[in-house]
């Protein structure tokens, strides 16, 4: 880790000494990095260079997902990491050296209200916001809750109420999503 060390006399205020010769800090030495992504060095998971700290906005990171989009039918896919924070959604690109590049302005100010709902699918990412069920694709963010109204005819629960605490799973084989809220299931 990056840091500075001194082998000399240090101030003893805020420290307590035990019977041995070690001085232990009494607390307050933790640092919270709620809006940072910390990356290890390429091919070395035990090395964390200073350029590997990427700040993502001002809010707390609540989830991440990968979004891959094909450039063309025969071209390679471009990978983007979608970062969900308490202040919006950020899209991070991978630079040529394998690290996340600088963070651009937010992709969207839409806030994910249920981190358990963040689900990657082929060419997209689902998540739940206060507006409803959202889908991120290479074309942007779309609210698809309106398209799903009436699909839950066998229940008297409003769709927006149902998805607030629901988990989402993607069935790759059948290309379908499962929206499950255990607290709303009938016995």
Label every PLM stretch briefly.
Residues 1-92, 182-187:
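N-terminal beta-propeller domains
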Residues 64-187:
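Beta-sheet-dominated scaffold domains
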């Amino acid at each position: 880790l990056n840091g500075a060390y001194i082998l000399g006399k240090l101030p003893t205020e805020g420290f307590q000494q035990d019977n041995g010769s070690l001085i232990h800090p009494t607390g307050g030495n933790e640092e919270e990095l709620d809006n940072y992504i910390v990356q290890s060095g390429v091919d070395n998971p035990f090395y964390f260079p200073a350029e590997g700290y990427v700040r993502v906005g001002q809010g707390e990171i609540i989830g991440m997902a990968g979004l891959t989009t094909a450039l063309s039918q025969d071209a390679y896919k471009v990978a983007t990491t979608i970062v969900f924070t308490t202040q919006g959604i950020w899209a991070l690109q991978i630079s040529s050296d394998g690290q996340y590049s600088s963070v651009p302005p937010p992709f969207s100010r839409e806030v994910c209200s249920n981190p358990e709902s963040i689900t990657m699918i082929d060419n997209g990412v689902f998540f739940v916001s206060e507006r409803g069920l959202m889908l991120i694709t290479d074309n942007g963010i779309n609210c698809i809750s309106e398209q799903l109204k009436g699909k839950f005819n066998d229940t008297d629960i409003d769709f927006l109420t149902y998805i607030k605490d629901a988990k989402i799973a993607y069935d790759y084989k059948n290309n379908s999503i499962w929206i499950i809220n255990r607290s709303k299931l009938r016995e």
